[in-house]
Amino acid sequence: MSETKTFEDKLQQLEGIVSELEKGDRPLETALADFQTGVGLVKELQGTLKHAEETLAKVMSDDDKLTDLELTND
């Protein structure tokens, strides 16, 4: 039975993949497989962040209705 990876575990795995790909010394087949794994991790991480944003919006709502959480890039 496999253990579910946390957001942080997945992010660390993605960072490792990026680091290895940036070196440029992997065989093409390995690099493509790593890239594909990385894309899958990005999609999972984005989904987790979207869910967290939706949860925060619900928690921060005064009237228990879903409201948009405005994010700024200050």
UniProtKB/Swiss-Prot annotation:
Record carries keyword Transmembrane: no
Keyword presence, Cytoplasm: yes
Protein keywords: Cytoplasm, Exonuclease, Hydrolase, Nuclease
Record InterPro entries: Exonuc_VII_S, Exonuc_VII_ssu_sf
Gene3D superfamilies, A to Z: Exonuclease VII, small subunit
Catalysed reaction equations from the record: Exonucleolytic cleavage in either 5'- to 3'- or 3'- to 5'-direction to yield nucleoside 5'-phosphates
Subcellular location field: Cytoplasm
Entry's Gene Ontology BP terms: DNA catabolic process
Pfam families: Exonuc_VII_S (PF02609)
SUPFAM superfamilies referenced in this protein's UniProt entry, alphabetically: XseB-like
Major subcellular site: cytoplasm
Any one GO cellular component localisation term in the record: exodeoxyribonuclease VII complex
Its EC number(s): 3.1.11.6
GO molecular function terms attached to this record: exodeoxyribonuclease VII activity
HAMAP family from the UniProt entry: Exonuc_7_S
Purpose of the protein: Bidirectionally degrades single-stranded DNA into large acid-insoluble oligonucleotides, which are then degraded further into small acid-soluble oligonucleotides.
NCBIfam families reported for this sequence: PRK00977.1-2 (NF002138), xseB (TIGR01280)
Subunit structure: Heterooligomer composed of large and small subunits.
Assigned protein family: Belongs to the XseB family.
Protein name, as recorded: Exodeoxyribonuclease 7 small subunit
